[in-house]
């Protein structure tokens, strides 16, 4: 066999094989490669978007956390102010109640003191009249007795 004819036959067979591959095998392979490239590109874009979204979400979370801390601080300050206000009001109310109770106690004490004085005056007057009766050894009539008691009570 001639080497030229074999080489020519192999070249024709190879050309037909290349043509067949280019016609029927190559387009689906290229389509699969292009689809894969598109998926990879879309995946990279999605990853970039996700990274940007993550950065944005972290920034938002950070700002919301700062806002929440600021709000919490304001609420705590308001609560402390309200606590101080309530304590001041309670102190004022307690002081007012104390003054009221002291005034009532002083009034009761004064009334009791006056009642005791009046009672003591009456007892002293009665004892004085009894002593005077014994000294005089005679009984004084009721009108005279009352006048003497009133007179002694007024002097005391």
Swiss-Prot record:
Family, similarity comment: Belongs to the ATPase B chain family.
Major site of localization recorded for this protein: membrane
Subunit structure: F-type ATPases have 2 components, F(1) - the catalytic core - and F(0) - the membrane proton channel. F(1) has five subunits: alpha(3), beta(3), gamma(1), delta(1), epsilon(1). F(0) has three main subunits: a(1), b(2) and c(10-14). The alpha and beta chains form an alternating ring which encloses part of the gamma chain. F(1) is attached to F(0) by a central stalk formed by the gamma and epsilon chains, while a peripheral stalk is formed by the delta and b chains.
Organism: Vibrio vulnificus (strain YJ016)
PANTHER family assigned: ATP SYNTHASE SUBUNIT B, ATP SYNTHASE SUBUNIT B', CHLOROPLASTIC
Residue ranges that the Swiss-Prot or TrEMBL entry lists as coiled coil: none
Keyword Cell membrane: yes
Entries under Gene3D superfamilies matching the protein: 6.10.250.1580
Protein name according to UniProt: ATP synthase subunit b
SUPFAM superfamilies to which the protein is assigned, alphabetical: F1F0 ATP synthase subunit B, membrane domain (SSF81573)
Transmembrane segments: 7-29
Subcellular location(s) per record: Cell inner membrane
């Amino acid at each position: 066999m001639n080497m030229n004819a074999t080489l020519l036959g192999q070249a024709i067979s190879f050309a037909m094989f290349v043509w067949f591959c280019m016609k029927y095998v190559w387009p689906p392979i290229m389509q699969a490669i292009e689809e894969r490239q598109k998926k990879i590109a879309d995946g990279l874009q999605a990853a970039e978007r996700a990274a940007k979204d993550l950065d944005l979400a972290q920034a938002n979370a950070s700002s919301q956390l700062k806002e929440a801390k600021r709000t919490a601080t304001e609420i705590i300050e308001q609560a402390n102010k309200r606590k101080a206000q309530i304590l001041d009001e309670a102190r004022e109310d307690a002081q007012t109640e104390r003054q009221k109770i002291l005034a009532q106690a002083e009034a009761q004490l004064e009334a009791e003191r006056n009642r005791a004085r009046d009672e003591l005056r009456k007892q002293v007057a009665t004892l004085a009249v009894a002593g005077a009766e014994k000294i005089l050894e005679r009984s004084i009539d009721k009108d005279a007795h009352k006048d003497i008691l009133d007179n002694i009570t007024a002097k005391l």
